[in-house]
Amino acid sequence: MDIKQQRAIDRYVGVPLCWLLSGVNRIISNEPDGVPPKKILVILLSEMGSLVLAHPMFVRLKQQYPEASIHVLMFAKNREVLDLMNVIPPENIITLDDSGFKSLVKDSLKAIFTMRKLKIDAAIDCELFARISSIFSYLSGATFRVGFHRHTQEGLYRGTFINRAVTYNPYRHLTQQFLSLAAALESDTTPANKLLPEPYTGKTPVLEFPVEELLQTTRDLHNFFPPIKEKKLVLIYPSGGILPIRAWPLKYYCQLAKTLLDEGYAVGVIGLKGDRAVAQQVVDFCKDPACVNLAGYTKSVRHLLAV
């Protein structure tokens, strides 16, 4: 499904479900009993980048609850990133196929059954605006339900069943926001955890590759694109993906690529297969054999990182 379809489903299906579940929660409320959670579910569906930024939160949860098992609910297309981070056991990852409406519904029902079977104690909804994630947090059966809430601010209606509601603060880095969600499990204020969380001082994870894998990746790249062989390679991503507003205007990428080439670097324009046309515009502007179109060249996130 594309982003417009996802938003439509989230609005026209999500709002009634949030309203219905809020009513159910008022009648049948399962409040936390104060016992530290033994099984924690983290819901991080849509953003590949958010998974990386959530690393400190995963570390903090393991520190706060060393006896607890941590599970993750996410879209299947983003799983590779979480596997590369190596913070969650593979068997604790629950995935949803969002390529179509039928597959999403089918996997959602499976996920709800799995979460109920696991007897989740706490659900941490890391999505900023989506309603589907808050619905999953309630249907997981968790008594602790942590998530962002608009409170008195403007924002999307996500129901009233989040019992550890955290105010989203656009002036804080997203890593701090995620740490606030972890801290909210033990918060007794309303909104939950209004203070800055304790700073994360741990090390940034580094992905290590076998030497032979890196050498083979380099050989393959140079065989495909001989002009870049003797140069340092800089990768740029001009597309913006499903949210083009994130990207600079294309002319800025063209100017950046030209400047890098003039300084002696090779430039690789990356992206998915669908981004090849945009990448080619940068290549055509530069008119330099050391500027190459790598959109669709890499086979996986790991392959891209190895490049």
Predicted region positions:
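Catalytic machinery of carbohydrate-active enzymes
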Residues: 1-307
